Amino acid sequence: MWATSEGPLQYSLAPTQTDVNSSYNTVPPKLKEMKNQEVAVGQKLVLRCETTSEYPALRFKWLKNGKEITKKNRPENVKIPKKQKKYSELHIYRATLADAGEYACRVSSKLGNDSTKASVIITDTNATSTSTTGTSHLTKCDIKQKAFCVNGGECYMVKDLPNPPRYLCRCPNEFTGDRCQNYVMASFYKHLGIEFMEAEELYQKRVLTITGICIALLVVGIMCVVAYCKTKKQRKKLHDRLRQSLRSERNNVMNMANGPHHPNPPPDNVQLVNQYVSKNIISSERVVERETETSFSTSHYTSTTHHSMTVTQTPSHSWSNGHTESILSESHSVLVSSSVENSRHTSPTGPRGRLNGIGGPREGNSFLRHARETPDSYRDSPHSERYVSAMTTPARMSPVDFHTPTSPKSPPSEMSPPVSSLTISIPSVAVSPFMDEERPLLLVTPPRLREKYDNHLQQFNSFHNNPTHESNSLPPSPLRIVEDEEYETTQEYEPAQEPPKKLTNSRRVKRTKPNGHISSRVEVDSDTSSQSTSSESETEDERIGEDTPFLSIQNPMATSLEPAAAYRLAENRTNPANRFSTPEELQARLSSVIANQDPIAV
């Protein structure tokens, strides 16, 4: 059999790449040495720190004179580019004397650290030196020589073997000079300070301007608010005034549409009542009375003011018997008053009565009855008993005068006055400003007279168709116009208050009078209008007869004619168709009145 033999195996001893990497990973990094360099001022200098092998995650640091150079403290002309894997460089641009010194490079990794140093000398070309061949290096000054540099400069000593050592100063950025004695940034800061001051002043000015504008706007706003409030108040007042004026105009328009408004309109009927204003309140039970109306024509009306007014009814009876004439004049005064002064102090006035030719109301008795209950307010009335008795005293001319026939030959049976001789005299009544208008007047007749009127009416019906009286009738007497007379009153019986105003307006009203006789008129004060008698008893009639003796004694026949005359007057007014009657009717009426009338009557 054939056998083979193989020689021994041989292994290569050369290390592989993996072995190298593994060995690098276990050995700490090592740097190459740097060379010292010397350059002139203003030249560029580059220092390079390199490792002998390539290590991952290496960190390089540069130090100058034992201090690490960082971005904060490095000079402007010194720059450190980005590190590479195996080396790091330091570039010095435009080198200065301050750049001279000892630079060191340090590398570190996880396995260990390593460092290397190099000296840099910066030479000044202007300085003369007698140095010969040799080298010089820069070292820090000793402690005693550090005072050579001022303002924080660093002192270095250049050692040159053939020459004596010299000192160099490395100055901060704001200083310069051989010993750092010159302050470079002084002018810069000065200029910057001026700018700062100007900027501050400008800022203050701006702040003041803005503040002033804000204050002005605030003041204007306050003024606007005040003005608005004032105008609002004024506008409200104007609206109130306009509203009031519109309301008044609306009321005026409504009043005009409703007709003219008169506070005291003239009455259509002049109501002649015996009115007495009492201080006490008259109960409504006494006020309910009948009212009958008759109309009388008045000559004219003077005013609408509620002053006193006097109406005098003067029926005159004239008759003639051949060559003799007799006159029977009867005055019956009806007093009408509506006093404003008394109405201020009293309660509602008394009832008002109306009268026609047949009957009359009973208001007079209620007034007289109420007048007796209030003697204080009636005591000073011009219609009181004392005043009437003084007015009718025979010593003075009496306003109510009765005359007997002038001829005694005329018997009472022949005294039948014709209808044409019966007239009424009514002076001016203060009622209305309209003139020459006719208004119905109202007379108040006591209840006793109404009873006698009824009796007289029965007798009048019996004598109406009697032919025996036709031959004895009297012809009408001639008429003539005369003026009324005014009667005087004594000064002592005038009221103490304001004197009454005459209502005739100083005019004398002319009336038609039969046979030339004059009618009488009585003016009475307007403050109160009531009569003194308060009841219908005989004692009151007798007392009135004692106070006025001449009324009951002078001519009883004339007083008995008063009811008949009043009745005839009312009948003629209410029934114009019977205004003209035969003399027989008048004589029958007269005789019946004489037979039935009491001798005492007022």
Curated annotation (Swiss-Prot):
Record region (Disordered): 293-366, 391-421, 460-479, 486-553
Pfam families in alphabetical order: I-set, Neuregulin
Glycosylation sites: 21, 113, 126
The keyword Protein biosynthesis is assigned to this record: no
PTM info: Proteolytic cleavage close to the plasma membrane on the external face leads to the release of the soluble growth factor form.
Polar residues bias: start-end ranges: 315-324, 460-474
GO BP term, example: ERBB2-ERBB3 signaling pathway
PROSITE patterns documented for this protein: EGF_1, EGF_3, IG_LIKE
Family: Belongs to the neuregulin family.
Protein name: Pro-neuregulin-1, membrane-bound isoform
